[in-house]
């Protein structure tokens, strides 16, 4: 805190209110409504994804390579809800960052890391579904648990190294005129990407993996269409497995679509803002960020709607049956679903 105060003495902070929080122009009713909506989203994000984590971890029937990827993605969403969204809620409603400059960087690093980690997970899931549907005979040898673990290592380590490296080196702000004064004097936890890093983040962290996902799912659904024409002539067990794989691909394709819908506006704004002389209103950027956060709220709702086994697992968790001995061997699939 002392270094922050020293910076304020070095710069003329009169334009920025000398680092103090501006008077909140929102009425008490508006703030209460914002807190209620955001707290509800945080609650669903934390406990919905926690239920998914417990379900896949506890029930042995769910220990598959695909579900291991979904488990890790649920951990990503849970961490976003638990460690990022509460602080962002206070900043958004109160129009002020109360937690200091160092924690601002830590917070933004985790925020950036988790959003990129999510898209890396979705790419991995797309690859998993590609082998399951397009190359089913090779699936068991290509998508083994050790392979999935290596994929998860990449999904977490690369975004983490990128996010913390860029934010703490402050490379993202090189060449931005007046940024030092803004950081020293502002009370809003300002993070602004220059043209180079804004473009790099959009291309490497969003556009390229998104394009890969869309291409892979396009191939998956093209192959699924071919399978649909011959599926009735297949042996019953192979027929049923293909139907299950197709349904799983459809569900995870919806998860991918919701992710792209929620996060594209935020990433696109990060790309454009430095070319528009950082003219994006703070309120708009804040709203787009929360629109991205809501993706992590939507995921457990999507799983609950499309996966009957998740609804059953949630019921068992709420009833406390998971504390019974040997309950982890319970069958979560009906006869119709396993056929």
UniProtKB/Swiss-Prot annotation:
Deletion consequences: Mice display increased locomotor activity and less immobility. Mice show elevated tissue dopamine levels in the striatum and an increased dopaminergic neuron number in the Substantia Nigra. They also show an increased neuroblast-like and proliferating cell number in the subventricular and subgranular zone, indicating increased adult neurogenesis. Mice lacking Taar2, Taar3, Taar4, Taar5, Taar6, Taar7a, Taar7b, Taar7d, Taar7e, Taar7f, Taar8a, Taar8b, Taar8c and Taar9 show no visible phenotype or behavioral deficits.
Intervals, Extracellular compartment: 1-36, 89-106, 172-195, 273-287
Any one annotated GO CC term: plasma membrane
Pfam family of the protein (one): 7tm_1
Subcellular location: Cell membrane
Sugar attachment sites: 18, 277
The keyword Transmembrane helix appears for this protein: yes
Keyword Kinase: no
Name of the protein described by the UniProt record: Trace amine-associated receptor 2
Source organism per UniProt: Mus musculus (Mouse)
């Amino acid at each position: 805190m002392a270094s922050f105060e020293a910076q304020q003495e070095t710069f003329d902070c009169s334009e920025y209110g000398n680092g103090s929080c501006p008077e909140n122009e929102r009425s008490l009713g508006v703030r209460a409504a914002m807190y209620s909506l955001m707290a509800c989203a945080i609650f669903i994000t934390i406990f919905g994804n926690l239920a998914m984590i417990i379900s896949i971890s506890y029930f042995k029937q769910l220990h598959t390579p695909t579900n291991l990827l979904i488990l890790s993605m649920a951990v990503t969403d849970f961490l976003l809800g638990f460690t990022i969204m509460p602080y962002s809620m206070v900043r958004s409603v109160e129009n002020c960052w109360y937690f200091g400059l160092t924690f601002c960087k830590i917070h933004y690093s985790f925020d950036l890391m988790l959003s990129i980690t999510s898209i890396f997970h979705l790419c991995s899931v797309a690859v998993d579904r590609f082998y399951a549907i397009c190359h089913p005979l090779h699936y068991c040898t290509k998508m083994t648990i050790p392979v999935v673990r290596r994929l998860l290592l990449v999904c977490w380590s690369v975004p983490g190294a990128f996010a913390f490296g860029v934010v703490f080196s402050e490379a993202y702000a090189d060449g931005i005129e007046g940024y030092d004064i803004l950081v020293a004097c502002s009370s809003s936890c300002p993070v602004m990407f220059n043209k180079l890093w804004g473009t790099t983040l959009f291309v490497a962290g969003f556009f390229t993996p998104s394009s890969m996902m869309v291409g892979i799912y396009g191939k998956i659904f093209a192959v699924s269409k071919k399978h649909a024409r011959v599926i009735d002539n297949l042996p019953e067990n192979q027929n049923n497995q293909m139907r299950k794989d197709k349904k799983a691909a459809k569900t995870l394709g919806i998860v991918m679509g919701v992710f792209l819908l929620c996060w594209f506006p935020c990433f696109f704004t990060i790309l454009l803002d430095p070319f528009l002389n950082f003219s994006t209103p703070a309120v708009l950027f804040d709203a787009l960020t929360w629109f991205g956060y809501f993706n992590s709220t939507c995921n457990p709702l999507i799983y609950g709607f499309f996966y009957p086994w998740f609804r059953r697992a949630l019921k068992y968790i709420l009833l406390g049956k998971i504390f019974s001995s040997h309950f982890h061997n319970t069958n979560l699939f009906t006869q119709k679903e396993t056929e």
